[in-house]
Amino acid sequence: MKRKIFLWHQKLEVFLKIEDEEIINRLKNVLRLKEGESVFFLNNFSEEGEYELLDSKKFIFKRKNLKERDLVPQRKINLYVSLIRKENFELILEKGTELGVYLFQPVISQRSSLKIKEIPSRWFKIIGSALEVTNWKHTPEIKEIKTLGEILKENKENFYLAHKEGEKINLKKMPQEINLLIGPEGGFSEEEEKMIREKTKFISLGDFDSRTETACLVFLSLLNFS
């Protein structure tokens, strides 16, 4: 398996000097990279390059080859996720990236269990790490946190809510770009559901019932790989 490391906002020039302490730690203590050995770097500009370590003290690399990552998923999926428990939300970020999500939109709802107002830097690291095991061209964007009311006012087209009482998903009828809303543990409140029904279409997995994060990943798998 290729040894890959994701670099945010760094172009893959012919010579590359790594200064990020976390990445240096991975190179030294996890990958145990020695001078003359190679590693693959990728970034959020769809680039992937193979690099040889020239200097193990200053962590200077020379590029051996460069390519553009060109794999695109079957559908463009914008995932609107209620702020559920931290570990479950981060699981959706990780696996959603691996499954080809185009955009993540965190949503504050009445039953949100994760109480934050700003995007943690850790979320970007999770996405970067997830991309290391894929060949996707696109790096998912994380939008600023919004309330459910703000989201619904945007009047998105092809907006769907994953809901156990919804119509069973028919993949042949699903559009190429999808806005998929995932509720919190316990679901949305009655008041919220009433607002959502006016703006979205409810879809389900039929008799399949599971945790929020599991249902979300099943939907993504079906939409992009069926």
How would you name each of these model-derived features?
Residues 1-15, 154-156, 170-176, 198, ...:
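Short, Lys/Arg-enriched, disordered terminal segments
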Residues 159-194, 200-205:
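Active-site/ligand-binding-proximal alpha/beta "capping" segment
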Residues 190-226:
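Structured adenosyl-cofactor binding patch, chiefly the S-adenosyl-L-methionine
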Residues 70-158:
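RNA substrate-binding interface of SAM-dependent RNA methyltransferases
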Residues 1-68:
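N-terminal positively charged helical leader segments and presequences
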Residues 10, 20-21, 44, 83, ...:
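Fold-independent oxyanion-binding glycine-rich loops
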